[in-house]
């Protein structure tokens, strides 16, 4: 499968189609002996797992791999059953919660810019309870009908507590390549070129079309005000807005829309070389059922692939 590397060492298929990953996995698995049956419980003999109970009967095996995913996208089958299986073997399960998830925003202007994707902007996540920035990165984000999404927002969401959302503000620097002083100079030059135009018609070289009415509204400058009437103070405030477009987080989107689940089987109870349980012989874990997660960009898939490979090697050890 042809792959490409993007900003931040994120790996994607060249086609940008997730279905190509699925197709590659399906091709690879052809010929394997598979049974399509709903697993309902693990079977034990003392401190050893000996099989799986399913809706179609019991199946016995020397080794059992739990690779059931988390609770994100339950339509794919990841309904959290793996946590139940792990607990039945005596494992500790760290509380599962949504991670890498779009956020709903209080301000209504996001809907006006719906569908707009911004590249090379900087997103900062401010935790007002701690008076500190808990995430800051440059990349891409997307305006949606409910708020914000895209790689930057997904990664930033991993640093927010889902039940205390009112403590977070998102700060978007629309022009991170320019400091405030240079941006003011840029605005001054643009205004000189458009000196007889209305303010709302003077920003086409600086901002995407969908974002212009949003910025005009937030700037406090009347859209039909002539550029030659804009004061130095108004120009400075506009520059400050472009460097710090601030939105208030309302809540996460439903867990069903999360890219990954944070939390899961405590990794201290799993052998990192073989992925075998330290509590139950013959029981192995791989992928998102474990308390391991990472940023978007193929890293979580790599965790799944690598832990599964280690488990497969562990079967024979």
Model regions: which residues?
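A glycine-rich dinucleotide-binding beta-alpha-beta segment and adjacent secondary-structure elements
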Residues: 35-37, 213-293
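A conserved FAD-binding loop/helix module that cradles the flavin
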Residues: 69-89, 292-317
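Glycine-rich loop(s) and the adjacent beta-strand/alpha-helix scaffold that form part
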Residues: 63-109
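An anion/pyrophosphate-binding glycine-rich loop and adjacent beta-alpha core
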Residues: 92-95, 104-229
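A conserved short coil-to-beta-strand element within the FAD-binding core of flavoproteins
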Residues: 35-48
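Flavin (FAD/FMN) cofactor-binding core of flavoprotein oxidoreductases
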Residues: 14-19, 99-107, 252-269
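Conserved N-terminal/central alpha/beta ligand/cofactor-binding core
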Residues: 1-32, 38, 143
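Short hydrophobic core segments
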Residues: 39, 52, 59-76, 86-87, ...
